[in-house]
């Protein structure tokens, strides 16, 4: 996607290297916006191979309101593993297990998973129970009843619960908009964005959410607008980013949803299909915790 490559180049060329809460310095640039036309294909990155099933499982996990990694682990999704593992290492129960041994315990021992697989009141909790409010249900009902509302907003930044989260939400507020052609667009505000590892997931995830909400509200998916506060490229991802910039984007794939689904909470992984996905080879990078 040209829009994503433009974002990488903007930050690489204009950002400033600085320290952050992790042990890895990053090139940071404040204030970006990218727009992805959802009528021209599903915006799944093609300049490196994406594990898109992991993206879909994570979104379904959010929609379930879950905050424990057990569901993700059971479905071989590894993107959240590091945070509960680092938290477990601080506990008196830690016996120098590797992260692989920790994840195996999560998978095989339900009581262990319940105690040590929890992330705190992160995305799923805030989506479905923000101080008692089910924001996703409210959002969809409001689109159905008052689609031109300018209050079609979900907030994940809950100051009263931030301290209890292993990782405060990076993508923290999103808003929907229906135009006079009955086309649905979504804008995400992301306070902090790991451009190499995180952002390709975020683009695909919120685009998928837009398509799903469009289906259950009888609208048509139009555009995903991605607004970022601190866009950053970690020091140990610079070579990977430069490699991506040498690669030409390929044709975008097509998203196919099960048209029989009328309630967003009824979607399962088998109801989401990607067709004609071709990409350049995968590029690995280490997550900063």
UniProtKB/Swiss-Prot annotation:
For this protein, the record's HAMAP family field holds: Thymidy_synth_bact
Extract one GO molecular function annotation from the record: thymidylate synthase activity
EC code(s) of this entry: 2.1.1.45
Species name: Malacoplasma penetrans (strain HF-2)
Q: What does this protein do?
A: Catalyzes the reductive methylation of 2'-deoxyuridine-5'-monophosphate (dUMP) to 2'-deoxythymidine-5'-monophosphate (dTMP) while utilizing 5,10-methylenetetrahydrofolate (mTHF) as the methyl donor and reductant in the reaction, yielding dihydrofolate (DHF) as a by-product. This enzymatic reaction provides an intracellular de novo source of dTMP, an essential precursor for DNA biosynthesis.
Per the record, the major location class is: cytoplasm
How does the record describe its quaternary structure?
Homodimer.
Q: Which InterPro entries does the entry link to?
A: Thymidate_synth/dCMP_Mease, Thymidate_synth/dCMP_Mease_dom, Thymidate_synth/dCMP_Mease_sf, Thymidylate_synthase, Thymidylate_synthase_AS
**Gene coding for it:** thyA
In which residues is (6R)-5,10-methylene-5,6,7,8-tetrahydrofolate bound? 194, 288
Localisation = Cytoplasm
Q: Which reaction(s) are listed as its catalytic activity? A: dUMP + (6R)-5,10-methylene-5,6,7,8-tetrahydrofolate = 7,8-dihydrofolate + dTMP
- Write out the similarity annotation: Belongs to the thymidylate synthase family. Bacterial-type ThyA subfamily.
Pathway assigned to this chain's UniProt record = Pyrimidine metabolism; dTTP biosynthesis
Please list the residues that make up the active site: 170 (nucleophile)
Which of UniProt's keywords are assigned here?
Answer: Cytoplasm, Methyltransferase, Nucleotide biosynthesis, Transferase
Pfam families given for it?
Thymidylat_synt
Q: What is this protein called?
A: Thymidylate synthase
Task: Please list the residues that bind dUMP.
Answer: 21, 150-151, 191-194, 202, 232-234
**Could you tell me the Gene Ontology terms of the biological process aspect for this record?**
dTMP biosynthetic process; dTTP biosynthetic process; methylation
Any one cellular-component term (Gene Ontology): cytosol
